[in-house]
């Protein structure tokens, strides 16, 4: 059974502070004081439960990421060119950190050493997570390891260096790794969650330092490799491989798939703890999200060859470009032959719901969850696939990657969907021009491992799509110029009716001037309701 975290009234009382004059000879019984609280394992657990709600990302933070991967009607300011220096802070909030430090300040009241170390591990995991998110956004940041009062002069101290904060973050993670339980549980923190976070943190910091010309990048990349290998060798986690569409089913599941998911966010219909991913993907009012054309182009063919090496790929129609591709494409967007879970009816992409024509399906379950705020599938936050990708990328950036390393990481991801393995020698001998291009790829990648680094980035983008990674991946790779590139949708040869999924029924009509007669489900006037890159033909222009 999934645990539900409810902070009791005891906790609410425990964090209430009052001042008592000396003449009081009794502690008021309507309050609990830190000096007399935190004495039992239950009290430690109750207090630290709040960190799950306060610091774990929500579903919307994960599935609706703004980047060059998913295009929506409302662009993030970084991509629209409208970002300005704000008049006041946004995200500069330390309330959650104060709660963590307050707990750590008093947890020594508990004399049960094992219990105290476990819940100190929870607190220090979340402090590491808090600071990792802040460093990603701000760089240098003030480090606090004690709870401050509103008049404490340390509130106004200068920022600590990125180097100092990241070192402290790793110390917290190492403590969590040593003290959290080894028993798998996708809904509470374990040793394996802490190793996965260390893998993530160290990959980010190592590659950020490498591509931004900072020192010690090797230290962090080696730490990423070490944490990843420990996880891979000791945790017992593997990839979810059940059924004919395991990648799709991994995310379209009420409960987290414990084979692969290390930790995730719990949603529960019976408690009205819900999110909105399915309405986001299947309505006209949630930004009409769709995958960007260049990301679709980056999916390989099913035999491992490059789609962008095919003659005429630029002007292929939707049904043509979807043929014989990496199976993860058809498990992430609607492609010809798509059916909803629980239905046998074939459904085409709906351009009323997606502005690019690449209609998202990741996280979507049966159609009854399409209504607003009805989704209750749990959201994976840490999964084994990410650790594999972190491991391979860190070794490639260090120059220590071997084919054997690929075989125990990237190969496993491709095996799940029936794809051929990545050949390191071939990748480095023939780097992909599409991924080298400033318009569609990563021109900053150089050196002997250029080809395999590009292929690992391709794999990461595809495997972790809509999981909240893309924006900061681009930032750490120093490829922010990607946000200046065009955001495009499917190719439309010209006015006319189109059977997008080739089921024998027309799905959309693109027209110029007077709307034609007929019974097509959707009519779009070129130049008014939709813009194409060549006027009356071309790619859908989204912004």
Residue ranges and their predicted role:
Residues 1-7:
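Bacterial N-terminal signal peptides that target proteins for export
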Residues 17-19:
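C-terminal motif of bacterial Sec signal peptides marking the signal peptidase cleavage site
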Residues 21-76, 166, 173-175, 188-195, ...:
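An aromatic- and glycine-enriched ligand-binding surface/loop that stacks and positions planar moieties
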Residues 33, 41-49, 53-57, 73-138, ...:
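Conserved, well-structured interaction surfaces
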Residues 93-94, 168, 248-300, 374, ...:
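Long, intrinsically disordered, low-complexity segments
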Residues 135-142, 184, 204-213, 397-400:
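Short coil/turn linking the two alpha-helices of tandem helical-hairpin repeats
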Residues 140-162, 209-223:
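Short coil/linker segments at helix-helix boundaries
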